């Protein structure tokens, strides 16, 4: 995969069977919203060959959040924890949530529609061992994801 403006990409699957948000999540680091309006993005169909391998995972709901310039790598020993309900204040040992804010709201970005919801969320990358120890898989308001691909890093 090569797309100007995209620096990292990694796909994840929810750990809990009844995850409150999405069964699958893909996290990308992009330079700006202009990536989604580029000819290069349109030429790969906004998903490319990697998306063809994950057709069951793709519903084409996209959001762009500001708050992390470059999404960190998540190894097989790690998890991504998302919180879509920012009314909670999470104080968990060994877990630091980074607050994110929708960067665009609802709008068209080239061939891609961004829905802008939720307008705020938080993300943490933590050890799977910590997820188990704190029983985060069944903690209301949190969704836990494990990697299903290695992290792509643009050359």
Map each language-model feature to its residues.
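Macromolecular interaction modules
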Residues: 2-155
